């Protein structure tokens, strides 16, 4: 059975980590305009690329999205 959660809901499980993924999760949490109900990679990627408040490399988002797709399976 696959979970039906948005990327934002997954990101909230990453907040508080002391690594780049945790920092990125905190930046997403602080962005009030972040698309909280979205799960599409391209939509999320475009949003992150066009908003300058995200200071970490896109590779961190890519890794988090991979983690998200794995998390949905369990």
From Swiss-Prot:
It comes from the Bacteria. Gene3D superfamilies: YozE SAM-like. Belongs to the UPF0346 family. NCBIfam families: PRK13672.1. This is UPF0346 protein SERP0997. It comes from Staphylococcus epidermidis (strain ATCC 35984 / DSM 28319 / BCRC 17069 / CCUG 31568 / BM 3577 / RP62A). The lineage of its organism: Bacteria, Bacillati, Bacillota, Bacilli, Bacillales.
